[in-house]
Regions:
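WD40-repeat beta-propeller superdomains and closely related acidic/aromatic-rich repeat-like regions
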Residues: 1-233
Length: 233
């Protein structure tokens, strides 16, 4: 199994090779074959709709409907994929140092480039007004508050360090995010003014994962050397 995704209603999706699978409730497994190895999976925030990222685009699939899946093309290898919380945009992290997106109302393309390295971690801020990303020596936040998303706009850059961001996680309710870095540093950052709180001093190994609890009262981190931490707010 290469990828997994969970739906708030309890459905689960996973992929193996070129095939994506979905199981919802007591229903039988349903599967979809795509043209190449699945790079990432994401459920839409409303309804049972699954985005399947792969080489040269993303396939949008309603497992419980007979309609043909919709294909969103863009040349290149698409890995992580995410819907915006308002279901208006779809964004992928690519094998190259870039993001690609589509405005779902008309499938208009959105290019988000300029990264020095591959984007391996993406997270929507509370309310979905911005998308926080790794891949640079600061957290890059692309604006999605308007109907055009980030098209024609410059991203914000917060929490710069002399080392690359490896993981990001946004607080579920407040305009706060956590950032993990290649040197093991973890910062908590307030988006309004960029104020930073040091959660974990550089420990040597890169931060591999960050996560908030559902209520936003706990922040956890894990590093590539096996170290982990839990912060209670």
């Amino acid at each position: 199994i290469d990828n997994v995704a969970l739906h708030p209603d309890g459905a689960v999706a996973w992929s193996a090779g070129k095939t994506a699978f979905v199981r919802s409730g007591k229903d039988q497994e349903k599967s979809l074959d795509v043209p190449s190895t699945v790079g990432g999976l994401a459920f839409a925030p409303k309804g049972l709709r699954l985005a399947v990222a792969h080489y040269n685009g993303v396939t949008l699939w309603f497992p419980n409907m007979a309609a043909e899946p919709e294909f969103l093309p863009w040349t290149g290898s698409h890995l992580a994929v995410t819907f915006s919380p308002d279901n208006k945009f779809l964004v992928t992290a690519m094998h190259e140092a870039a993001l690609h997106g589509w405005r779902l109302a008309d499938n208009r393309h959105m290019r988000m480039t300029g990264y020095p390295g591959r984007v391996r971690s993406i997270a929507w801020t509370a309310g979905g007004k911005a998308l926080a990303t790794s891949g640079a020596d600061a957290v890059i936040l692309w604006p999605f508050a308007s109907k055009d998303g980030p098209m024609g706009k410059e991203p914000a850059m917060l929490a710069p360090l002399k080392t690359r961001v490896t993981a990001v996680a946004c607080h579920p309710d407040q305009a706060i995010f956590a950032a993990g870095y290649e040197d093991g540093t973890v910062l908590m950052v307030r988006m309004a003014d960029g104020a930073e709180i040091l959660v974990h001093r550089n420990g040597g190994a890169a931060i591999a994962a960050l996560a908030w609890s559902a209520k936003g009262t706990l922040l956890t981190f894990a590093a590539q050397d096996g170290e982990a931490g839990l912060l209670t707010l």
